[in-house]
Amino acid sequence: MSDNTGTPEPQVETTSVFRADLLKEMSGAGSAPAATGADNLPAGSALLVVKRGPNAGARFLLDQPTTTAGRHPESDIFLDDVTVSRRHAEFRINEGEFEVVDVGSLNGTYVNREPRNSQVLQTGDEIQIGKFRLVFLAGPAA
């Protein structure tokens, strides 16, 4: 705070860290499975990588018949933001295929920027839950 001596207060500057490695990984440059470790996943499992949102870069393993996602603290994938419903979506494994199912969320679930109640997922699909954008990467087939 200035004490009226005519001396201006110092300006505070902020900086951000640019992570080129994360950008390259998310843009699909090079081999996406190798860059993310999806090729090392157990057979029949998959990986969700947070591309955008408060915890960008976080990874979630999909290896159970049903994996829940939402704002509820007991969700398997806890996405803590008001744009996410408490019980927002489920990721299900059906006959070797991964499917995302909206479970009655307020803001909906999007796959590749299109609203979906349910959708079978392919490697590289982008799932939006609230302000979070996650990329789906399938591991080796079972």
UniProtKB/Swiss-Prot annotation:
GO terms for cellular component: cytoplasm. It is found in: Cytoplasm. Residues 67-116 form the FHA domain. Its main location: cytoplasm. Signal peptide: none annotated. The modification Phosphothreonine is found at T14. InterPro entries: Cell_Proc_Reg/RNA_Proc, FHA_dom, OxygluDhInhib_OdhI, SMAD_FHA_dom_sf. Keywords: Cytoplasm, Phosphoprotein. Gene3D superfamilies: 2.60.200.20. An essential component of the PknG signaling pathway. When unphosphorylated, it inhibits the activity of 2-oxoglutarate dehydrogenase. When phosphorylated it does not inhibit 2-oxoglutarate dehydrogenase. This is Oxoglutarate dehydrogenase inhibitor. It comes from Corynebacterium efficiens (strain DSM 44549 / YS-314 / AJ 12310 / JCM 11189 / NBRC 100395). The gene is odhI.
